[in-house]
Amino acid sequence: MKIILATSNKHKVLELKEILKDFEIYAFDEVLMPFEIEENGKTFKENALIKARAVFNALDEKQKKDFIALSDDSGICVDVLEGNPGIYSARFSDKGDDKSNRDKLVNEMIKKGFNQSRAHYVAAIAMVGLMGEFSTHGTMHGKVIDTEKGENGFGYDSLFIPKGFDKTLAQLSVDEKNNISHRFKALELAKIILKILNKG
């Protein structure tokens, strides 16, 4: 069984390939011509399923027998921002790039009079294939701070300190991050489903 990742985000592709290294993984643009997918769901799970369905439906009939489309939708929910940016994490600012998104998060927090806040990451993994549709979830709790620290990672990693740590995700090694991340937890559950489907 082959897995096609329903993302063109290079950081996510690397992270997903590392965690799913027991499987034959292909990035979206290694198999298909890139196309835009409108993420108009109201939850992480809905958006993950929208992306996985779109990629699976773009495969030809032969490819559909060989591939399962796997998608991740994830984001950060900040308590003092009433759970925002949530599903809009990747496009929180007008520019929609990581730095602008982080800057907006910090500015919104400071506007409310806070220099840190409890927060959590959520990841939803969706898998779509001829055998059906499946999804898993993972969370990671901690806090966001108002000063970026660390060079690793992407997204909001340089602002997020996981519970039980005194470093941001961007200060942790890839292995340290992968062992505690929301995406890792959701993918560990997804791997169980994928192994069962592979036997079937």
Swiss-Prot record:
UniProt keyword Nucleotide-binding, yes or no: yes
Binding, substrate: T7, S8, N9, K10, H11, K12, S74, F154, G155, Y156, D157, K177, H182, R183
Its job: Pyrophosphatase that catalyzes the hydrolysis of nucleoside triphosphates to their monophosphate derivatives, with a high preference for the non-canonical purine nucleotides XTP (xanthosine triphosphate), dITP (deoxyinosine triphosphate) and ITP. Seems to function as a house-cleaning enzyme that removes non-canonical purine nucleotides from the nucleotide pool, thus preventing their incorporation into DNA/RNA and avoiding chromosomal lesions.
Keyword Cell inner membrane: no
Top-level taxon of origin: Bacteria
Gene Ontology MF terms in the entry: dITP diphosphatase activity; ITP diphosphatase activity; metal ion binding; nucleotide binding; ribonucleoside triphosphate phosphatase activity; XTP diphosphatase activity
GO-annotated biological processes: nucleotide metabolic process; purine nucleoside triphosphate catabolic process
Residue positions of the active site: D73
Name of the protein in its database record: dITP/XTP pyrophosphatase
GO cellular component: cytosol
PANTHER family, alphabetized: INOSINE TRIPHOSPHATE PYROPHOSPHATASE (PTHR11067:SF9), INOSINE TRIPHOSPHATE PYROPHOSPHATASE/HAM1 PROTEIN (PTHR11067)
Protein species of origin: Campylobacter jejuni subsp. jejuni serotype O:6 (strain 81116 / NCTC 11828)
Pfam family name, one: Ham1p_like
